[in-house]
UniProtKB/Swiss-Prot annotation:
GO cellular component, one term: cytoplasm
Matches recorded under NCBIfam families: murC (TIGR01082)
Protein name in UniProt: UDP-N-acetylmuramate--L-alanine ligase
InterPro entries in UniProt: Mur-like_cat_sf, Mur_ligase_C, Mur_ligase_C_dom_sf, Mur_ligase_cen, Mur_ligase_N, MurCDEF_pg_biosynth, UDP-N-AcMur_Ala_ligase_MurC
Catalyses which reaction(s): UDP-N-acetyl-alpha-D-muramate + L-alanine + ATP = UDP-N-acetyl-alpha-D-muramoyl-L-alanine + ADP + phosphate + H(+)
Gene label: murC
Phylogenetic classification of the source organism: Bacteria, Thermotogati, Thermotogota, Thermotogae, Thermotogales
GO biological processes: cell division; cell wall organization; peptidoglycan biosynthetic process; regulation of cell shape
Broad class of enzyme this protein falls into: ligase
Stated family: Belongs to the MurCDEF family.
Keywords, in A-Z order: ATP-binding, Cell cycle, Cell division, Cell shape, Cell wall biogenesis/degradation, Cytoplasm, Ligase, Nucleotide-binding, Peptidoglycan synthesis
Top-level taxonomic group: Bacteria
Pfam entry (one): Mur_ligase_M
Localization per record: Cytoplasm
Annotated metabolic or biological route of this protein: Cell wall biogenesis; peptidoglycan biosynthesis
Length: 445
């Protein structure tokens, strides 16, 4: 079968393209720019067109598209005019999974990628040989966001579209549900919650939910969190640099958890994985042992030393919701308690900025100095009356040193590095380009 992927370089799409290529399908596709993922695919013999064009056409049997691609895309138009089946990446993933293998899914607003990576790591260590579809990059996976295997499927189930509700995993973790993509549910919170309820009802064996999440805590077979009623409860947590140690209780029995990744949110992510694998019949002690060797996911608290002597560091992080930013700043304070924190934040999507209103300023006010760049639209239509300047204005009203910057490149070119300072580059767009430029300009050899 010949498969055309429209938006082939995206994290979610490239994992599907990798899977298809490695099982012997004829794969090609298009994207608007080159990336590490397109380079990997090319090395496997995948033809990739840069730019979307009516002539990007090799007579496919099926066309798969990312949610960022709309019906006016010329390749979609040509496919439909020729009677070629056009499906979303959700539909395509659903078809891949529908072959009788055991399925482990992770969904929710925050922490999906790290939790999925933890789950995949543990199943690999436990000898399950999983096939993994990840919504980020983890270096332990053969292709970063994809791992071929003969065992169960492990996948990140993106809740941004109502289509996720049709999936039927055997085991599922819901990290939380905050309505981060409510615009895709017509702003209807009840519809959003009903979609979570639907996928829970379709889950064949067990569902693990966060006991403190008001939208989904009651949907789980088992729960994790700080609540006394949690199946897996956090009793105590200590830390030493990037390492942390927790005492947890599962079904009345206490255990010790050690992680090499910082932040209470990662302890909770690990607890979700422990609870799910315990429900699937794995020994808790074996899961705890596997988690000791887990390393962080790319762009999740990625630390770079800029100038060790002057104690200047850079953190690159994908955080793009207010809750994720709060966790990031809290973790930074834990790991680097004496350093000043300077944040360069790129808001992601106009709809999110509009929906969250003043929540970004509230989340960012824990930083010492904040620079807000222009919104990364992520293929959304520009909303002229919405500007990221509103975040900077909100921070100034809190008495913070904050500034809106139209040109992030110019900002870092003129930065005078301050000693004993952490520079945090935060967002889900192309802020990584700015962080990489910053590191190249300022890092001491």
């Amino acid at each position: 079968m010949r498969i055309h992927f429209v938006g082939i370089g995206g994290i979610g799409m490239s994992s599907l393209a990798l899977h298809s290529r490695l099982i012997g399908e004829d794969v090609y596709g298009s994207d608007i720019y080159e990336s590490e993922q397109t380079e990997i695919l090319r090395k496997l013999g995948v033809k990739i067109f840069i730019g979307h064009n009516y002539n990007n056409w090799l007579y496919p049997d099926i066309v798969v598209h990312t949610p960022a691609v709309h019906s006016d895309n010329p390749e979609i138009i040509r496919a439909r005019s020729n009677g070629i089946r056009v499906v979303s990446r959700f539909e395509f993933l659903y078809d891949i999974l529908n072959n009788g293998k055991t399925q482990f899914a992770v969904t929710g607003s925050d922490g999906k990628t790290t939790t999925t990576a933890m789950l995949a790591h543990c199943l690999k260590v436990l000898g399950e040989d999983p096939t993994v579809f990840l919504g980020g990059i983890h270096r332990s996976l053969e292709f970063g966001n994809y791992r071929p295997g003969k065992g169960p499927y492990v996948y990140e189930l993106d809740e941004s579209q109502p289509e996720f509700s049709r999936f039927s995993p055997d085991y599922m973790i819901i990290t939380n549900a905050r309505g981060d993509h409510l615009e895709n549910y017509s702003g209807d919170r009840q519809l959003y919650r009903d979609c979570f309820r639907s996928v829970v009802m379709s889950t064949r064996k067990s569902v693990v939910t966060f006991s403190e999440d008001e939208n989904t805590s009651d949907l789980g077979t088992w729960t994790f969190g700080k609540s006394i009623n949690s199946t897996c409860r956090l009793i105590d947590r200590n830390r030493n640099g990037l390492f942390q140690f927790a005492k947890i209780e599962i079904n009345g029995k206490e255990y010790n958890l050690t992680l090499k990744v910082p932040g209470e949110h990662n302890i909770l992510n690990a607890m979700a994985v422990i609870t799910l694998l315990w429900s699937a019949g794995h020994e808790v002690e074996e899961v705890l042992k596997a988690l000791e060797d887990f390393t962080g996911t790319y762009r999740r608290f990625t630390v770079t030393v800029i100038d060790e002597k002057r104690k200047v560091y850079m953190i690159d992080d994908y955080a793009h919701t207010p809750d994720e930013i709060k966790s990031l700043l809290s973790t930074t304070r834990e790991v680097f308690p004496s350093q000043k924190r300077v944040v360069i934040f790129q808001p992601h999507r106009y709809s999110r900025l509009m929906r969250e209103d003043g929540n970004f300023a509230k989340a960012l006010k824990d930083a010492d100095e904040i620079y807000i760049t222009e919104v990364y639209s992520a293929f959304e239509q520009t909303i002229p009356q919405i500007s990221s300047k509103v975040i900077a204005d909100g921070l100034v009203s809190y008495g913070k040193k904050a500034q809106y910057v139209a040109d992030a490149d110019l900002l870092i070119e003129n930065f005078q590095l301050q000693e004993n300072t952490i520079y945090l580059f935060v967002g889900a767009g192309d802020i990584i380009r700015i962080s990489q430029k910053f590191a190249k300009m300022h890092a001491k050899k």
